[in-house]
Amino acid sequence: MVFDELITEFDRGLRSIAGVSRMSRPVPKPAAAAPAELSAAERKHAAGLMRVNHVGEVCAQALYQAQKLTTSSAGLKEMFEHAAREEEDHLAWTAHRLKDLDSRPSLLNPLWYAGALAIGVVAGRLGDKVSLGFMAETERQVESHLDGHLSELPAADAESRAIVEQMRADEVKHGKSATDAGGIELPMPARMLMRAASKVMTSTAYYL
């Protein structure tokens, strides 16, 4: 681990928490040319869902940073970096959509980031196969979570839907990459604990 790498990851972490992440791909757009009008209630609900998604991407940045820093494999470092760059797009897209909805990111982003970073370090210290298994299980749970949001988003909110659909496609790809790279299936207690932690995060971030 070199000093330059630590500085780079520290900068990425600050940008993730502050909501000023860079995007390498443009914000996904729906096929319809003109956005539909949302009621006040629909905007509030869509904003809550997109705030949850934004928090998920803050956590993803922390997890991948920790896993990248704790592996000694150059190939896995590159895989985690590639996934982190795509997740950084998600972070920027959801922040952009929150602004469009006249809303804001979670006030607890520093807490979410710190917790995810600690979990990522623990997963990384348990070895590459466990770390990759953790990545695969995380992506499976995120995929399920995004499926739920696609059914919950207001029918008229095509802009948020386009973003979530592309995020879902990327998460599926990341999960498959982790499994193909040798990730093991985590034991049921670990998967249940991850779901419980995710439920606390999503139910809180919707409002805060």
UniProtKB/Swiss-Prot annotation:
One of its GO terms (molecular function) is metal ion binding. It is found in: Cell membrane. Fe cation 1 binds at E57, E87, H90, E171. It holds the Pfam family COQ7. GO terms for cellular component: plasma membrane. It is an enzyme of class 1 (oxidoreductase). GO terms for biological process: ubiquinone biosynthetic process. It is a peripheral membrane protein. Its main location: membrane. Pathway: Cofactor biosynthesis; ubiquinone biosynthesis. The keyword Cell wall biogenesis/degradation does not apply. Binds 2 iron ions per subunit. Fe cation 2 binds at E87, E139, E171, H174. Gene3D superfamilies: 1.20.1260.10. Its cofactor is Fe cation. It catalyses: a 5-methoxy-2-methyl-3-(all-trans-polyprenyl)benzene-1,4-diol + AH2 + O2 = a 3-demethylubiquinol + A + H2O. Its EC number is 1.14.99.60. SUPFAM superfamilies: Ferritin-like. It comes from the Bacteria. Keywords: Cell membrane, Iron, Membrane, Metal-binding, Monooxygenase, Oxidoreductase, Ubiquinone biosynthesis. Belongs to the COQ7 family. PANTHER family: 5-DEMETHOXYUBIQUINONE HYDROXYLASE, MITOCHONDRIAL, COENZYME Q10 BIOSYNTHESIS PROTEIN 7. Catalyzes the hydroxylation of 2-nonaprenyl-3-methyl-6-methoxy-1,4-benzoquinol during ubiquinone biosynthesis. This is 3-demethoxyubiquinol 3-hydroxylase. It comes from Burkholderia mallei (strain ATCC 23344). The lineage of its organism: Bacteria, Pseudomonadati, Pseudomonadota, Betaproteobacteria, Burkholderiales.
